[in-house]
Amino acid sequence: MTQSQHSQSPREALAERIVEAKTRKNLTFEQINEGTGLSVAFTTAALLGQHPLPADAARVVAAKLDLDDDAQRLLQTIPVRGSIPGGVPTDPTIYRFYEIVQVYGSTLKALIHEQFGDGIVSAINFKLDIKKVDDPEGGSRAVITLDGKYLPTKPF
């Protein structure tokens, strides 16, 4: 039976255990994800408390991280989502995304509405991909693809 959390606390505590085990075992999220059949972005979000994992995927990651049966079951529960309590994020990496939305949010909204009509881009029917590419001017660039299904507003 599908279970749902009513508080972020259990999944936050599990996320701490997961990061500690990942560090202790010197694993990458990609290595932990291998064999789950899921994208590394989805599995990472689940391990950090933002998604439930299917039972098979939970078994795979629990084995790699030496998590007990209770932790494995908890990974399968529907979490209370949202990882930025208290408003504006203070972590520099997360803040840059907040800044991107502050600068480009109205532009994204205008262009989405112009191209698709009144509606939203789903964060549920959604895919995320991150790639590291060489910058022709030196260094590296992060190519981040946000791929969400468009959902039109339906009058009622």
UniProtKB/Swiss-Prot annotation:
What Pfam families does the record tag this protein with? Cyanate_lyase, CYNS_N
- Which reactions fall under this protein's catalytic activity? cyanate + hydrogencarbonate + 3 H(+) = NH4(+) + 2 CO2
Q: What superkingdom heads the lineage? A: Bacteria
Q: Which GO terms describe its biological process?
A: cyanate metabolic process
Q: What class of enzyme is it?
A: lyase
Listed A to Z, the keywords are:
Lyase
The record's annotation in InterPro entries points to: Cyanase, Cyanate_lyase_C, Cyanate_lyase_C_sf, CYNS_N, Lambda_DNA-bd_dom_sf
A GO molecular function assigned to this protein is: cyanate hydratase activity
Q: What is its EC number?
A: 4.2.1.104
Classification via SUPFAM superfamilies:
Cyanase C-terminal domain, lambda repressor-like DNA-binding domains
Q: Residues in the active site?
A: 96, 99, 122
The protein's matches in HAMAP family, at most eight in alphabetical order, are given as:
Cyanate_hydrat
Q: Which family does it belong to?
A: Belongs to the cyanase family.
Q: What does this protein do?
A: Catalyzes the reaction of cyanate with bicarbonate to produce ammonia and carbon dioxide.
Q: From the Swiss-Prot or TrEMBL record, give the protein name.
A: Cyanate hydratase
Give the organism the record lists: Burkholderia mallei (strain ATCC 23344)
What gene does the UniProt entry assign to this protein?
cynS
